[in-house]
């Protein structure tokens, strides 16, 4: 064989092979490669974050209810009041001074960042939310891990996107990836974690988003398995549908779960409103909430020696699944948990609503099951079956997320025996709750802030993404109440404005003064010896908060007709931060259009 011609032969064949069209194809284009790698990184980060967060809660819980409570044995059960109050003493200042978006249950804050800020979340949220929520849960706060880990994972995804200087659309996707990974790792539920991110956060099921989110969820779940092993959140006995007639009972329970879910949502925000009226410093409110929570804990402690309304309450849920709780206990714990959760979050605590929703759903279902079983003992399954279905039905009604509710219960329990009643009750609950209230517990919080989620999720409204803080004029000419009208006339002449904000000595907004009133007095020749306070025409003007979208200011301008809308602090003090005029809104809108065009151009290049 002549080997001397081998190099030429190889070269000839290589040229022929390289000429084939398929060699010019790529398995992944640049965009897909970027999303694959970044979603993998976010999955690793959120998985590790979820493991650390869970271990931090366990460590703090042991510190609080073993070490500290052990030192207070002679004061039992007063330690149930002191420990939640101590937790509140840490949570309040931590949230108020370092990251106020860490207050509450977390998911609405993520949705707000996706809608208003292109998914950009401050890096400090990772640390503050981790500490605040772990302290709150460990000290007895009636909240869950789902909201915090969703926000923590989302913040990690946002950080990755910002560091790599990705476009807004990609940052949003990575935020959803982080949330999916956090939930998957926390609850051993990768499918539900991915669906939660798509159904609740992104509100769309596009193939591009689905692939990235699933990669993050699976990666995070693998990380959690490596450190903590493969274990179900809840153990359940074997349940089955005893009779087709039971489906009618499950349908009725789904309706009741929907009404209870809507009631919970409204009571939660009613509690927030009531706490906002209490005139004490904001950082101290969680202390008061902790004291009141402790009183509820003592009530539940008297039943069987355990404060079942504290924390996530998974042990109590599992007891209800095995039908180990009496009718009186399930009904009593339903009411106590409702009060405990609204107290914790209303007073400024930090934690999610998923675990409390499962708890209340289990207690509602257990109560319904006890009653149904006592009436139809031969044909109705034990109360534990109704508790299991009630968990999904209640959360579906609260979050308006039936697919997530069904899947997460499957993955947390591993029980597929009563799939029909579970799906039926959850869908019925979601339909009824949507008819009673158009907003879920997440979107209602945003609506109260003036944030309306875009109906067309494929093209997010640019005006929705521009906040008052981004657009406002901070260097506005604010005038004092005691300013002489002659001086006010000079101020109007130099600024060419038709209305100016009036402030008190402490910089709080007193109202608006317009040039119309000043012109009337000038024509009458009575400007001398009079002050702004004498002609203050608009004493209670419509205002806007820094985090609210500027389209709200446009609406106020139309209603008020005074030419400017004051921007005031969120603390309730009405401290003037700036003003919004039509020209400010137009400038900010033009800037947003330009940035969106640059992002689209950047995507086309990649």
Predicted regions and their residues:
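Short beta-to-alpha loop/turn elements within the nucleotide-binding domains of ABC transporters
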Residues: 466, 483, 513, 530, ...
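The conserved cystathionine-beta-synthase
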Residues: 479-496, 503-504, 522-525, 543-570, ...
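Alpha-helical transmembrane segments and immediately membrane-proximal extracytoplasmic
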Residues: 1-465, 469-470, 474-475, 479-491, ...
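Acidic/proline- and glycine-rich, intrinsically disordered low-complexity segments
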Residues: 469, 528-533
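Short, intrinsically disordered terminal tails adjacent to the first/last structured region
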Residues: 1-12, 570-571, 599-606
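Short hydrophobic beta-strand motif reused across regulatory alpha/beta modules
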Residues: 407, 510-518, 577-585
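Short, solvent-exposed cationic patches
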Residues: 532-542, 597-606
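Flexible loop/coil segments at beta-strand boundaries within sensory signal-transduction domains
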Residues: 505-508, 571-575
